[in-house]
């Protein structure tokens, strides 16, 4: 073993040589010393065991090269450790164990010709090709790419994030005692499946076991926050020696690939859906969501903040080329600290598929601002390697919040200055009483703010004011981005899931963002919410399997937004970033998640309209509690909300009928400021109508005054026209006249409107005729036209009913009588003729019947005119009725007109009406004519109707005759 010797990273160039002569000499020395040491079987097994991560599954690339040496070139030199064993086959341990080793597979295929006695590996050649394919695009100069030292226990994965250097020895002992059974059956070291229940320890288990120990401050504290914790963090941070800042811009030789499944896929381009994970504050597989700067620029995302990879080829490149750049020149102590920092930043840093740019060690507090400013300037000059807003990453994230142990804008790369500016602008200094620590409260705002800047403001350290120019573009993307800035925890059902992980007081939540759309909960969340949604009365909604806009969108913070009513959005009862969709805004929430402003603990999606809010707790309680009897006084302060709700509106209408004066005054005071809005509301208009009916007289007058100057637009509105009609019915005459005059010049427009015609009809009914002369005079010369209009025909009928002025009547009737036949056959005009027959004067009926004489059979066979003929039979006098019957019977014994009418689909109803309305003598005459044709009528569909009616009449006549015969002898 070679303790404390770190390998210096080196980038591959375009030439064939992988490294220079100096490095070849150094590597030769290291390999020679390593070869001279004979490792016992148990030591070798321990060494191999250290190569696998105790915190997360290693990459396939790393597993292949881990046991074979860190500087392999594909030949037998990397596998000299296998050649120095104690057994005859050249192995120092059990054959079965080494045959499971993926490094042995490469060794076998490289040396099988030199040593035919080598036992075959347990991995097929096809699996090897897949592993080599995943490895081929890596720019690591051999090795796993995780900066582990050769045969050194100081490997990154031997000390997971959250462990300080005092815990390394204990962790090594635990790793040494681990049995070889941790090797998976698929031959990959520490590569469990994606399923639940792997044998390997998770980060959560390690954190829980290490709760009592201090942690060095990286950028993310890894255990629940307390004052002592931050004190320890600051002390630990101050104890760290400054390490050299690494260069910016050069591609990094360190890469990680995400574990895609329990076994190697035969396809080198794995399905990106396999990487989807729960967007909870949990640790994610190494490498998920990481894309190098060069690759990121060529990635086409669905939205500005969508971190998902759209192409499977991009995913392959990302898996093998996810970089963390760095430079050499680190001392041994700084190397160890940076190794730990690299993994910690990787595990807790950007998760959103944004570019991971060059990470830096912790500088001293005295020179933080100077270094950060220079490095930020450098990062702006190098747009290809640094994260910018154009790439979706924002300001270079490694320089954010250098003076803050907890911050919550890591996902989109905003520096503290921009964050605090947004906090000031959007009022994120309203914290929920649920979260008691400053860290949780700081993450409650939708923009996220430093926990030590509760009121917003600028952070001096690490600040570059030039980057605040990106705020406008960032705000535009927030307002218009399809994926939205959402928080999964804003969903109260998600609180149960989050609470089970004990996350509310964890400061690491501040920076644990799931920006990558493929890191969203596609399986676990839907399964969980599917079972939980029934508790809240709303089914789970989702789009396609790839849709991340419902409960799965990239989040903008781990904590929900401010629950208080937002001062920039006074009409919304919630804060600004809710993940709830438009169809779910009225879902019932637990009362514990509500606050005094009527909002819900959560945020409001920015693409929702301003009038889409969540109902108040009072309204929700009213709708959910069916047994309790509410009174009007109990909903004080919520009358407008109740009026806009279906059940709340009905409740107010019922209570207003028997309300006291005080209750009416309370309702009146609340609805008056919103009267016009309620008049056009689907449910609110009924409350206004009911108040016109049952309100106090002064209140009705004041409410009617609200209508002035708005009569025409309200008359043309679906719900407003109902309020206008009710007002015309109940308000005082002077107000009626004033309201009606607003329609002057717009009468014909209102008559032809589906809503306005009702207002005109109500004016004709309720306003004295002398006050609506301008309406009636508009109809002169247009009576026939209006009579054939679907809405105008109703207005003409109201005129015939309520206008009794002789001059008006004569003018209207003259136009109608001149076109009786045409109107009788019109689909709307026939109603006007029927109205005249029913309500007109006798001489007017006679004129109409005479006009139809000679055309009765023809009119009876017409769909609309047949109704007019029936009205003539119903309302005509005996002489007029006899005249019509004789025309139907005809002049011959065959009764041809009658036969034609009985077989017609419309005229047969006229014949039935004749049998109902004529006297007994005429009925007997008609029945005698019909009986002759009964057998023939049974063959026709409509003739059967006549047969059935005749049979009933005959049966009724026979019974009547029988009764008469029985009563006559008794009388005698």
From Swiss-Prot:
Pumilio repeats lie at residues 634-669, 670-705, 706-741, 742-777, 778-814, 815-850, 851-886, 887-928. The pumilio repeats mediate the association with RNA by packing together to form a right-handed superhelix that approximates a half donut. The number as well as the specific sequence of the repeats determine the specificity for target mRNAs. Keywords: Cytoplasm, Phosphoprotein, Repeat, RNA-binding, Translation regulation. This is Pumilio homolog 2. It comes from Arabidopsis thaliana. One of its GO terms (biological process) is regulation of translation. Residues 1-25, 139-163, 211-249, 268-314 are annotated as: Disordered. InterPro entries: ARM-like, ARM-type_fold, NABP, PUM-HD, Pumilio_RNA-bd, Pumilio_RNA-bd_rpt. The lineage of its organism: Eukaryota, Viridiplantae, Streptophyta, Embryophyta, Tracheophyta. Residues 219-228, 236-246, 299-314 have a biased composition (Polar residues). GO terms for molecular function: mRNA 3'-UTR binding; mRNA binding; RNA binding. Sequence-specific RNA-binding protein that regulates translation and mRNA stability by binding the 3'-UTR of target mRNAs. Binds the APUM-binding elements (APBEs) in the 3'-UTR mRNA sequence of CLV1, PNH, WUS and FAS2. The modification Phosphothreonine is found at residue 269. The modification Phosphoserine is found at residue 202. SUPFAM superfamilies: ARM repeat. PANTHER family: PUMILIO HOMOLOG 1-RELATED, RNA BINDING PROTEIN PUMILIO-RELATED. Pfam families: NABP (PF07990), PUF (PF00806). It comes from the Eukaryota. Residues 614-954 form the PUM-HD domain. SMART domains: Pumilio (SM00025). GO terms for cellular component: cytoplasm. It is found in: Cytoplasm.
């Amino acid at each position: 073993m070679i303790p404390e010797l770190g390998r210096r990273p080196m980038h591959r160039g375009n030439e064939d040589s992988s490294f220079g002569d100096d490095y070849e000499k150094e590597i030769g020395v290291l390999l020679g010393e390593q070869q001279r040491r004979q490792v016992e079987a148990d030591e070798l097994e321990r060494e191999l065991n250290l190569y696998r991560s105790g915190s997360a599954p290693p990459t396939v690339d790393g597993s292949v090269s881990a046991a074979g040496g860190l500087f392999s070139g594909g030949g037998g030199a990397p596998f000299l450790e296998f050649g120095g064993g104690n057994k005859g086959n050249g192995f120092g341990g059990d054959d079965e164990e080494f045959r499971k080793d993926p490094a042995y597979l490469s060794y076998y295929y490289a040396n099988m010709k030199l040593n035919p006695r080598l036992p075959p590996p347990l991995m097929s050649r096809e699996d090897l090709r897949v592993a080599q394919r995943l490895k081929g695009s890596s720019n690591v100069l051999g090795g796993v790419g995780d900066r582990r030292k050769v045969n050194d226990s100081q490997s990154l994965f031997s000390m997971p994030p959250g462990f300080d250097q005092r815990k390394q020895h204990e962790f090594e002992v635990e790793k040494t005692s681990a049995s070889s059974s941790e090797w998976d059956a698929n031959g990959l070291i520490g590569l469990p499946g994606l399923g639940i229940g792997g044998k390997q320890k998770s980060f959560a288990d390690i954190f829980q076991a290490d709760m009592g120990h201090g942690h060095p401050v990286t950028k993310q504290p890894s255990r629940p926050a307390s004052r002592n914790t931050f004190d320890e963090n600051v002390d630990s941070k101050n104890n760290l020696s400054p390490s050299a800042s690494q260069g910016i811009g050069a591609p990094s030789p360190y890469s990680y690939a995400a574990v895609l499944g329990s076994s190697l896929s035969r396809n080198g381009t794995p399905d990106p859906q396999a990487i989807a994970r729960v967007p909870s504050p949990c640790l994610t597989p190494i490498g998920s969501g990481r894309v190098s700067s060069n690759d990121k620029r060529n990635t086409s995302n669905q939205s500005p903040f969508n971190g998902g990879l759209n192409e499977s080829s991009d995913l392959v490149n990302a898996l093998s080329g996810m970089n963390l750049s760095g430079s050499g020149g680190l001392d041994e102590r700084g190397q160890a600290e940076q190794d730990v920092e690299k993994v910690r930043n990787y595990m807790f840093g950007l998760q959103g598929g944004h570019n991971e740019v060059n990470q830096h060690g912790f500088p001293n507090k005295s020179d933080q601002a100077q270094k950060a400013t220079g490095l930020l300037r450098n990062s702006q000059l190098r747009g290809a390697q640094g994260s910018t807003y154009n790439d979706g990453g924002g300001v270079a994230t490694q320089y954010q919040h250098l003076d803050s142990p907890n911050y919550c804008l890591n996902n989109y790369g905003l520096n503290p200055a921009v964050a605090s500016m947004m906090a000031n602008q959007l009022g994120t200094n309203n914290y929920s009483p649920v979260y008691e620590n400053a860290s949780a409260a700081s993450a409650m705002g939708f923009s996220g703010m430093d926990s030590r800047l509760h009121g917003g403001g600028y952070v001096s350290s690490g600040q570059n004011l030039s980057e605040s120019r990106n705020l406008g573009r960032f705000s535009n993307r927030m307002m218009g981005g399809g994926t939205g800035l959402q928080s999964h925890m804003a969903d109260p059902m998600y609180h149960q899931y989050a609470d089970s992980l004990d996350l509310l007081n964890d400061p690491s939540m501040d920076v644990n963002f799931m920006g990558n759309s493929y890191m969203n909960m596609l399986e676990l969340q839907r399964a969980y919410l599917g079972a939980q949604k029934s508790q809240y009365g709303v089914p789970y909604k989702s789009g396609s399997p790839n849709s991340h806009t419902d409960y799965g969108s990239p989040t903008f913070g781990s904590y929900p937004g401010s629950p208080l009513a937002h001062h920039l959005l006074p009409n919304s009862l919630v804060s600004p970033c809710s993940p709830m969709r438009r169809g779910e805004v009225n879902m019932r929430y637990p009362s514990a998640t509500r606050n005094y402003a009527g909002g819900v603990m959560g945020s409001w999606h920015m693409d929702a309209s301003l009038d889409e809010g969540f109902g108040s707790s009072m309204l929700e309680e009213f709708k959910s509690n069916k047994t309790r009897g509410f009174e009007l006084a109990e909903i004080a302060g919520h009358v407008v909300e109740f009026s806009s709700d279906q059940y709340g509106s009905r409740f107010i209408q019922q209570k207003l009928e028997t309300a006291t004066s005080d209750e009416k005054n309370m309702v009146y005071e609340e609805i008056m400021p919103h009267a016009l809005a309620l008049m056009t509301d689907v449910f609110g208009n009924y409350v206004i109508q009911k108040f016109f009916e049952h309100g106090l007289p002064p209140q009705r007058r004041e409410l009617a005054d609200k209508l002035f100057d708005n009569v025409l637009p309200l008359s043309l509105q679906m719900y407003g026209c109902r309020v206008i009609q009710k007002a015309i019915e109940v308000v005082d005459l002077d107000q009626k006249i004033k309201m009606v005059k607003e329609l002057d010049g717009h009468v014909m427009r209102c008559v032809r409107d589906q809503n306005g015609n009702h207002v005109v009809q109500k004016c004709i009914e309720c306003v004295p005729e002398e006050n609506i002369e301008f309406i009636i005079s508009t109809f002169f010369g247009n009576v026939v036209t209006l009579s054939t209009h679907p809405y105008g025909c109703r207005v003409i009928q109201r005129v015939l009913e309520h206008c009794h002025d002789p001059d008006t009547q004569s003018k209207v009737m003259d136009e109608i009588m001149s076109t009786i036949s045409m109107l009788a056959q019109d689909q709307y005009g026939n109603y006007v003729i029927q109205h005249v027959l029913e309500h007109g004067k006798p001489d007017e009926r006679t004129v109409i019947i005479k006009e139809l004489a000679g055309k009765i059979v023809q009119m009876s066979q017409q769909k609309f005119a047949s109704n007019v003929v029936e009205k003539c039979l119903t309302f005509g006098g005996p002489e007029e009725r006899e005249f019509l019957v004789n025309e139907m019977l005809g002049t011959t014994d065959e009764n041809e007109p009658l036969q034609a009418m009985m077989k017609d689909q419309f005229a047969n109803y006229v014949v039935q009406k004749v049998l109902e309305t004529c006297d007994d003598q005429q009925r007997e005459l008609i029945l005698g004519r019909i009986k002759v044709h009964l057998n023939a009528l049974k063959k026709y569909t409509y003739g059967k109707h006549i047969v059935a009616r005749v049979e009933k009449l005959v049966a009724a006549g026979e019974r009547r005759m029988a009764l008469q015969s029985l009563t006559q002898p008794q009388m005698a």
